[in-house]
Amino acid sequence: MDIQQYILNNTGVLLPISGGNGKSQDQAVVIASKATYRLIQVEDDFISAMLDEGYWKKISQSLIFDDDKKYDKITIHHFLDNGDVEQRVFWFDVTECFL
């Protein structure tokens, strides 16, 4: 099952995405060009959909240029229900949004 279908099945939200799970640059979530004007919202919706519990806060966001690709690297703090806090990183290939 691809990542778009996984999120649709779990949340009922259809995001304009493809590609990987966002855990690394090599597995970046590809955001389609039709999301250009709501890029941040799509990224935030994806992060929320991937977290099973608690809430999160964005710590940093960086636009990274790598050859002909553009990536958003987002670092968050994930506040778990048991009181623990995890730092997590999500990668998004936003190249299509800059064409």
Regions found by a protein language model. Give the residues of each.
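N-terminal trafficking/processing presequences and adjacent post-cleavage segments
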Residues: M1-F46
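Short, compact, well-ordered microdomains
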Residues: I59-L99
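Generic detector of leucine side chains in alpha-helical contexts
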Residues: L8, L14-L15, L39, L51, ...
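Residue-level signal for the start and early helices of compact helical domains
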Residues: R38, I47, D81-V85
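Alpha-helical structural elements
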Residues: M1, L51, V85-Q87
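Short secondary-structure junctions
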Residues: A49-K58
